[in-house]
Amino acid sequence: MAPSAISTSPPPTDRVSSSLASYKGYDHVHWYVGNAKQAASYYITRMGFKRIAYRGLETGCRSVCSHVVRNGDITFILTSPLRSLDQVDRFPPEEQELLKEIHAHLEKHGDGVKDVAFEVDSVDSVFYAATNNGAKIVSQPRTLEDDNGQVRVATIQTYGETTHTLVERGSYHGAFLPGYRMETGVEDPISQLLPGVHLNRIDHCVGNQDWDEMDKVCEYYEKALGFHRFWSVDDKQICTEYSALKSIVMASPNEVVKMPINEPAKGKKQSQIEEYVDFYNGAGVQHIALLTDDIIRDITNLKARGVEFIKVPDTYYEDIKVRLKKAGLTLHEDFETIRSLDILIDFDEGGYLLQLFTKHLMDRPTVFIEIIQRHNFSGFGAGNFKSLFEAIEREQALRGNLV
């Protein structure tokens, strides 16, 4: 189904966007978690990531620890505090502030995404264009250095307590960043016993907002970061009997970075967006979509590794089969295999996408992962939103949150 609200406006051509046409894609996603070692183990054992870098006591970092894992070009940093709040006075001011920040983030949000980092050609041009147009500074541009070269970084604020770090790698040839011990080649023994998961890159990263906050956030991306409105749907298109939402996808000038922004809309009961904002205690990253070139292989293997996905009712496939036949569209993949794996299908006259969503990654019903495969289709599954919402509402009802 082609979304009826795709933006027809071209990317902005003012001085902001011209300074920002240097986005290269997502660099990494930084999570604050209660136990980084265990969280890293989850992504390694369940989702086929590999350990690539570490920072902690053994590297001279006495206040926090970080485990870095990667699958394809998808990199997650998982960071935890090593000390309690009553011990912060032992550390220099910068480390004190970091410890306080992590503890406060965990107390307020639970495990969640703190930073979505973008790789850029020039940190300085993106940073100063952003800050000159209203972006809040978290950290000024600075250069990190080790034997593998230099990396330039800077950080700005986005919605809620989430941030965007800008990363300029230049000729740096280390596995991750200066300050981390490289662990490439460190193979988890369990990887020899489990089927492989071969993901490509981050496709998009979705942020949930509270009531009436979406437009303000989108305007911030337009003004400060030079993004443009790539795609949008309203509550008439994304609704069930009980709940609804609105969504606008913001894209970088060259469209290599896409950041969908959601907000709740009026319905009979609490929507999944309201549930998220309630349990996350504010705006934040709802899910990260990971692109694959073989979703059947990867969903099959993720399920074999124990990853839990939402369940799609059989009636969905009876309906989609009729719609596909009417449109004269033939899938490259076997339809019955797609049905058996609960994979969702959306399409238009040009192509189609296949997607499936995990259940929430933690006990708080906040963050989850999407696995997505695209066949000449740049949309975001508008045709699946009703089925997806209904599946999520069934989970909400089990949690007692569909009220």
Swiss-Prot record:
CDD domains: HPPD_C_like, HPPD_N_like. It catalyses: 3-(4-hydroxyphenyl)pyruvate + O2 = homogentisate + CO2. Fe cation binds at residues 204, 287, 370. Binds 1 Fe cation per subunit. Its EC number is 1.13.11.27. Residues 25-169, 201-359 form the VOC domain. One of its GO terms (molecular function) is metal ion binding. Pfam families: Glyoxalase. Disruption phenotype: Impairs growth on L-tyrosine as the sole carbon source and affects homogentisic acid and pyomelanin formation. Leads to increased sensitivity to reactive oxygen intermediates. Induction: Expression is induced by L-tyrosine. Expression is positively regulated by the cluster-specific transcription factor hmgR. It comes from the Eukaryota. Pathway: Amino-acid degradation; L-phenylalanine degradation; acetoacetate and fumarate from L-phenylalanine: step 3/6. GO terms for biological process: L-phenylalanine catabolic process; melanin biosynthetic process; tyrosine catabolic process. Keywords: Dioxygenase, Iron, Metal-binding, Oxidoreductase, Phenylalanine catabolism, Repeat, Tyrosine catabolism. Its cofactor is Fe cation. Belongs to the 4HPPD family. 4-hydroxyphenylpyruvate dioxygenase; part of the L-tyrosine degradation gene cluster that mediates the biosynthesis of the brownish pigment pyomelanin as an alternative melanin. The 4-hydroxyphenylpyruvate dioxygenase hppD catalyzes the conversion of 4-hydroxyphenylpyruvate to homogentisic acid (HGA). The protein hmgX is crucial for this conversion and thus, probably functions as an accessory factor to mediate specific activity of hppD. The homogentisate 1,2-dioxygenase hmgA is then involved in the cleavage of the aromatic ring of HGA and its conversion to 4-maleylacetoacetate. PANTHER family: 4-HYDROXYPHENYLPYRUVATE DIOXYGENASE (PTHR11959:SF1). This is 4-hydroxyphenylpyruvate dioxygenase. It comes from Aspergillus fumigatus (strain ATCC MYA-4609 / CBS 101355 / FGSC A1100 / Af293). The lineage of its organism: Eukaryota, Fungi, Dikarya, Ascomycota, Pezizomycotina. The gene is hppD.
